[in-house]
From Swiss-Prot:
GO terms for molecular function: glycine binding; glycine dehydrogenase (decarboxylating) activity; pyridoxal phosphate binding. Its EC number is 1.4.4.2. Belongs to the GcvP family. The keyword Glycosyltransferase does not apply. It is an enzyme of class 1 (oxidoreductase). The lineage of its organism: Bacteria, Pseudomonadati, Bacteroidota, Flavobacteriia, Flavobacteriales. This is Glycine dehydrogenase (decarboxylating). HAMAP family: GcvP.
Amino acid sequence: MRTDSFALRHIGPKAENLQEMLDTIGVESIEQLIYETIPDDIRLDQPLNLPKAMSENQYAEHIKKLSEKNRVFKTYIGLGYHQAILPAVIQRNILENPGWYTAYTPYQAEIAQGRLEALLNFQTMVSDLTGMEIANASLLDESTAAAEAMALLHAVRDRKQKKDDVNKFFVSQQTLPQTISLMETRANFLGIDMVVGDHEEFDFSEEYFGALVQYPGKFGQIFDYANFVENCKNANIKTAFAADILSLVKLQAPGELGVDVVVGTTQRFGIPLGYGGPHAAYFATKEEYKRNLPGRIIGLTKDLDGNNALRMALQTREQHIKRDKATSNICTAQVLLAVMAGMYAVYHGPKGLEYIANIVHASAVSLEDSLKELGFEQLNSAYFDTIHVKANASKLKAIAEKHEINFFYPDAESACISINETTTTDDLNAVIAVFAELSEKKHAEIEELSERTAIPKNLERKTEFLTHEVFNLYHSETELMRYIKKLERKDLSLNHSMISLGSCTMKLNAASEMLPLSNPQWGNMHPFAPVNQAEGYQTVLKELEHQLTEITGFSATSLQPNSGAQGEYAGLMVIRAYHEANGEGHRNVCLIPSSAHGTNPASAVMAGMKVVVTKASENGNIDVDDLREKAIKHKDNLAALMVTYPSTHGVFESAIREITNIIHENGGQVYMDGANMNAQVGLTNPGRIGADVCHLNLHKTFAIPHGGGGPGVGPICVAEQLKPFLPGNPVIKTGGEKAIGAISSAPWGSSLVCLISYGYIKMLGTGGLQQATEYAILNANYIKARLNDHYKTLYSGERGRAAHEMIIDCRPFKEQGIEVTDIAKRLIDYGFHSPTVSFPVAGTMMIEPTESESKPELDRFCDALISIRKEIDEVSVDDSNNVLKNAPHTIHMLTSDEWKLPYSREKAAYPLDHLHDNKFWPSVRRVDEAFGDRNLMCTCPPTEEYAEA
């Protein structure tokens, strides 16, 4: 065995297993399997033009050398990004721990109670600091959250406002520039007339339905918004604040003013800058708007025994169910980062956060005092952490950069200096020395921080926060480590067993790919630092763009979108911009197959498109005749087709090139959803099938971990004609010559985790990437063959093969009273996370094993499903007290003095022998979804309620 081959470590099946797997499938070779799976006319005839694979050791040396090309200055740029201190106990036990970063979104609540509790802590932290009633479990970034706030306030207009088409939304010019740009992008096709101006001159016209202000403003000034909010209320204008999370420790909570929505980022709570992300945004609002809240919400409920349990609440709001009528297209959020930010608050507690905020504020005040002594005027009358100093910007910049210091320069005559948690008195004195050099004056050094405050009394926070016990218990490293481990043990992730979620691609997230994330040379780079200071990042990002462009067969790539849903939206906006540039801005019809992922129609609506659904044929494929008929019918207004390939049914449809040709013949562009790209890499590509743009899920195909529900990266790759329209950024120039507005806050989105995909491609190389795809298809077809006598596979290709996933039909079991949910919960007793349930077909399971799973693990999974199939045969329709209906079974049930169930404890907990050696115990019984929605509670319950559990 070659110990220097990363492909051998990444791909699960061993060489000695291969023939047995092929025999089970009924083919002689992998080549034959691929031939029978992928249509002849779309297979690539040349290998990918990428460098040969690096070993893990070679890659470690390579990425280290690149990191040294990043010149990480002391940076005081601010603009929503501040260097923070990540406590080592959180870095070691969460960020670097596969028990946390390999988990999936907590749809199966019984095996996700740990991260659900961590997310409830996050929601409680946000609710407390903002003074709002309800918060979600994170969004992608602050700018996206602000755009979602605008969309929510538009959705909750009263009946008269909707009747009168009140569509104006005011945004303060003090809002962060990237937020304004992204909101303008979003408002464009939502029928919202967004007006940017001075909030002090706002006329409170009845033409407005909402307004957003920054708190504090982008240059650091704290404004007293009390009268503004009151006047908005009187004019029936709802208000949103974009608030700095750390400043809320010292400033009046927006909720006390009667604000409707508060958004922001929690990056300051210990999360590395990472050249733009990933970071967890927050979104808090009033309870009356709970059904319009974007993203996931964690709420309290009960399990079958009446014990407290947690689960994702109000899931009917989500795109999978509401589709084009969903509250938002957001699916992936930033769970891992939200967990870390929440743990930062748990570790420091209210007193620790006050200490940090006080030091930051005192440092800013002390710096102002020292600069005034040098003769510089400071423009902010009230501030928390940022001072705005009058000075010759070009001269100051030259001196500062010579001393490896970055400021923000809003104009030619001033600079903003944002203090952060890492700023020391030595750092302050270095800043003072720069201004002294500029003024050619001697200066005195700061020895002790000032006790003066720059926050007016009426704007100081007077209410308590983080009073719940969880924020006041775990302040030693020992206690926090044990608390984190206690939560981790409640969750099933890839470090226990395979997670076969269809359309989710839960593959290995290799340690070699993950290690660079902890390197401060990558972590401490500000996204708005001058590009020449980020040579290491620029090298990685440009090469990754090239790699993805080659893999997809397109001409250019943008890494900016922070999730697959955001990538979908970006791709559709690029198509709209293309049509407008051609004088065909009226093209707004988007054809979407009925089987499409729910984010597709939700994204299309956000892009201002009219969704027209096309039928599926009996075999699950797109009905080509129906598609042609609708394309011709709408040819004058056809903008795009959204198509997933291979299909969401797990099939390479042979008519795909005919389908894309129909769209092009009728004036449209083809958008390919890249959710299933793991079945294409190296064998075919979106360009080959005739698509014009696709998004990729780097958190699926390219090994970024799911993190329990984020981070994600959803880059878009485009054909030549769409290249000029790739998204831009108002602070650092990115994108095409005719760039659409910002899609994410940061110029290159979540740059830090792009290192993972870069490493994945570098270490697999051309051959390894193709091999990974082949083995993903092999593993799926092996499972299909093993289950063939026990479950019906709904869809197959023309030669009887699945792509990288397949759907098994569980609907016939209703005759015995068994639902697909019962099978999902019973799989927990066997130590497995359920496959994807009821998508894209209700009453089914979609299974995707990925290339990373070994034959023994595939066999354990198949054995579990076969055993469950036998259990189904043992029950009758009148029997509701059986091993499936009562699943999952907890250790509390098994060790109870009483056992009144009609089957043995052994059957309940150890249905297969191997479980005696490696048993995963769910911490709660089956949760009551309806109870949780009827009794919504989205902050930490009182301690006595935990005691009842």
